[in-house]
């Protein structure tokens, strides 16, 4: 059991952005969110695009197709129309094998190349679309989500630096985020009803670990910059779905 906790904590805490970079990014997104949903959507799209271009180990030419698909899909969220975004996402998904076939030079199988391109644009695109649409409906829910992620990752980094707390860092970081969620609901900083605390607490407690492990095991093989947004990757779309289905 002790070895399992140590291995899980090591994998869980492996995908971390620098505290300074994450603080600046979170502040920038919250500032854009305070201006409006459109500004937020453009900002998060440009931010993820810039980070991926700066940190990718693939040439700009080779990185062009997945980043183009990402931008087209991500910016569809600006229209605040889930059906439109779904159609754009499906079209991009269907076109991915064709793009992989055109760019395949025999160094990898078509299936591997297709999955490589998909992992580079679909998860960050889905994150951007979902948060942009949610921002158009209720910006406070997006602000709460960004704050929860920030303090979760902050707690994770602080615990990971202490040998005594390192193996328990996933539990302590998630507990801190859930406590912050409870506090936000108690002082009515969010439209989430008090009776929905436990479903959203479960979302935070289980969504972040799943998101971080999924990112490390699958996404970062192609899109290295995914390490910077590991906690957001799957949690963002799930948070949006829960907010739209249960709150708004």
Task: State each model region's role.
Residues 2-225, 236:
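Membrane-embedded alpha-helical bundles of polytopic integral membrane proteins
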Residues 1-4, 245-247:
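Acidic/proline-rich low-complexity IDRs
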Residues 226-248:
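Final/C-terminal transmembrane alpha-helix of multipass membrane proteins
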């Amino acid at each position: 059991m002790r070895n399992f906790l140590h291995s899980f904590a090591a994998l869980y805490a492996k995908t971390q952005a620098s505290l300074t970079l994450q603080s600046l990014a979170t502040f920038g997104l919250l500032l854009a969110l305070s201006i409006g949903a459109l500004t937020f959507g453009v900002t998060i799209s440009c931010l993820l695009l810039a980070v991926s271009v700066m940190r990718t180990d693939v040439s700009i030419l080779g990185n062009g197709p997945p980043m183009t698909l990402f931008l087209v899909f991500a910016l569809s969220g600006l229209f605040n129309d889930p059906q439109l975004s779904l159609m754009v996402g499906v079209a991009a998904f269907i076109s991915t094998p064709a793009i992989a076939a055109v760019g395949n030079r025999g160094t990898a199988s078509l299936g591997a190349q297709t999955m490589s391109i998909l992992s580079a644009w679909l998860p960050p695109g889905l994150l951007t679309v979902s948060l942009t649409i949610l921002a158009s409906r209720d910006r406070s829910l997006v602000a709460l989500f960004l704050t929860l992620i920030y303090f979760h990752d902050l707690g994770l980094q602080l615990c990971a630096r202490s040998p005594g707390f390192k193996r328990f860092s996933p539990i302590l970081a998630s507990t801190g985020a859930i406590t912050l969620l409870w506090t936000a609901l108690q002082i009515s900083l969010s439209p989430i009803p008090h009776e929905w605390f436990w479903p959203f607490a479960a979302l935070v407690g289980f969504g972040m670990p799943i998101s971080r492990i999924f990112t490390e095991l699958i996404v970062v093989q192609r899109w290295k910059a995914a390490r910077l947004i590991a906690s957001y990757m799957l949690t963002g779309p799930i948070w949006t779905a829960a907010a739209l289905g249960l709150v708004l």
